Amino acid sequence: MVLVYALLRLPADADTPPGTLSILQFNLCGNACGTRFAVADDLAAEITSRGRQPFVVTLNELCRGQYDRLLANLPYHGHFEPTIRNRCWDGSDYGVAVLVRSSDVTSAGSARLPAPAGGEPRTVTCVRTAVQGRPLVACATHLDTDPANTASQVAAVAEHAGAFRADAAVVVGGDFNATPDRPALDPMDAGFVEADAADDAFTGGCSRARCGGGPGYAHPTRKIDYVFLSRGDFTGVSALVSSAPHSDHTPLWATATLAPAR
């Protein structure tokens, strides 16, 4: 798999089947990289420039001030879930968020993730919306870098997000801090397909189903960002990346079409 920085241009809605969604997952590095509002402003500009703006945006390492700025500049609604209070340069909270290009958005709840080895607080947060009358739940998460925490946190995310599959299609975007060859990601495979692993090509030395051949790397020399989609609910799944000069991650853009209701 080769990192591609070419700007992805998605086709307009008129060129795609009904129910086709664009989904964006992005770790802004909103506090540690010191770019303050520049990373949020660049993201808003790129979203606005797209022929088809993403219906779902999942964000990590985000300051509440940046979240508010995105909502002020984009026709989106959503939910910000803090993980560390008053962490950011402007005194605002630090956390994860889900944005949806619709006013039909309600919080579906959050869950604190286990950390048997200790470390920074981690969470998964979800919102409920609908696409052409069909229920959709979108979740965002950011997992720990310590392998001792990864397995239990992935399992908790899979359980929390998977519970919504009874009555909704589900999207989970996040920085999982694990490369595709890691067995720790296995719990997500049971109920989800990863957008960047939907082809028949495989990364060298990797035979796992999620080690797809698309250019979906982030961070930016290895893949740790993912968009997972509930199995059986989506067709035509694909993913690409674009550049992000103010972050140490690259935006991961997924495209998928909702399948007929189960």
Regions found by a protein language model. Name each.
Residues M1-N73, N86-W89, P260-R262:
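N-terminal, active-site-proximal structural segment of metallo-dependent hydrolase catalytic domains
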Residues L24-D42, R87-W89, P114-G118, D144, ...:
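Acidic/histidine-rich helix-loop elements
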Residues G162-V170, A178-R262:
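Metal-dependent phosphoester-hydrolase catalytic domains
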Residues V57-N60, E81-P82, V171-D175, E194-A198:
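Active-site neighborhood of phospho(di)ester-bond hydrolases with catalytic His/Asp-centered motifs
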Residues T58-P135, L240-S243:
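Structured beta-strand-rich core segments of catalytic domains in phosphoester-bond hydrolases
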Residues P18-A32, G109, C126, P135-D144:
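Active-site-proximal beta-strand elements of phosphoester/diester hydrolases
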Residues F26-L28, E61, T141-L143, G174-F176, ...:
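Active-site metal-binding loops of divalent metal-dependent hydrolases
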Residues C126-T141, N149-F176, D181-D186:
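His/acidic metal-ligating clusters that form di-metal
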